[in-house]
Amino acid sequence: MRILLSNDDGVHAPGIQTLAKALREFADVQVVAPDRNRSGASNSLTLESSLRTFTFENGDIAVQMGTPTDCVYLGVNALMRPRPDIVVSGINAGPNLGDDVIYSGTVAAAMEGRHLGFPALAVSLDGHKHYDTAAAVTCSILRALCKEPLRTGRILNINVPDLPLDQIKGIRVTRCGSRHPADQVIPQQDPRGNTLYWIGPPGGKCDAGPDTDFAAVDEGYVSITPLHVDLTAHNAQDVVSDWLNSVGVGTQW
């Protein structure tokens, strides 16, 4: 199995390094990751400037100022030959649950892999300690995929409780929960008296029902949420069409 491995925490982050070491025991792994933390970069792609890469002695490649999406795009289309069999993103330092997937560079890297035609996993740890647990879970899933491919055409968003492996209760297939809207902005002043602003933490849980990713992780289970790229709200199409007809938009300007 040939794996393109990326993340949004940066090439030196403990999550990606722990996972790379574990994956290399049974797979051919090429790391292509940002040279710095690009958390929250979502699906952004660098179009207005060129991208430089740096290759380390162990073969890992850092993309200078690159986003997670840049890294997977370059990895698939230029840097990994032969091309990968699968794209894996992670292990992220912290969860990507519910609405987090909108902003997540970790999920975006997997999404780019799927967009380019490859199976893709995004892996996040609900904390900053037991990366070995998340690595073991990921390896188990990938070994299973080797034996029997999962032909859903979907991204698997995997969130792992920050627990020792022997305390993980199992795996649940879940849906995305949701958070309350975030509203915290933290102002500061620089030495010249100019105001600086920091984006605050995400909102608290809003929908954390028993079938959600939030609930699974809170209860000690690995959460696997299948994600797809199509953002169309199919069940709203008729409602919008009826509304347009009723208000006359499209027949008079």
Swiss-Prot record:
Cofactor(s) this protein requires: a divalent metal cation
Cofactor note: Binds 1 divalent metal cation per subunit.
Catalytically driven reaction(s): a ribonucleoside 5'-phosphate + H2O = a ribonucleoside + phosphate; a ribonucleoside 3'-phosphate + H2O = a ribonucleoside + phosphate; [phosphate](n) + H2O = [phosphate](n-1) + phosphate + H(+)
GO cellular component, one term: cytoplasm
The organism's place on the tree of life at top rank: Bacteria
GO molecular function, one term: 5'-nucleotidase activity
Pfam families the UniProt entry points to: SurE
Keyword terms of this UniProt record: Cytoplasm, Hydrolase, Metal-binding, Nucleotide-binding
InterPro entries cross-referenced by the UniProt entry: SurE, SurE-like_Pase/nucleotidase, SurE-like_sf
EC code(s) of this entry: 3.1.3.5, 3.1.3.6, 3.6.1.11
Annotated compartments: Cytoplasm
Binding site for a divalent metal cation: 8-9, 39, 92
Protein family per UniProt: Belongs to the SurE nucleotidase family.
Function: Nucleotidase with a broad substrate specificity as it can dephosphorylate various ribo- and deoxyribonucleoside 5'-monophosphates and ribonucleoside 3'-monophosphates with highest affinity to 3'-AMP. Also hydrolyzes polyphosphate (exopolyphosphatase activity) with the preference for short-chain-length substrates (P20-25). Might be involved in the regulation of dNTP and NTP pools, and in the turnover of 3'-mononucleotides produced by numerous intracellular RNases (T1, T2, and F) during the degradation of various RNAs.
UniProt-recorded name of the protein: 5'/3'-nucleotidase SurE
Species whose genome carries this gene: Escherichia fergusonii (strain ATCC 35469 / DSM 13698 / CCUG 18766 / IAM 14443 / JCM 21226 / LMG 7866 / NBRC 102419 / NCTC 12128 / CDC 0568-73)
Gene name of the record: surE
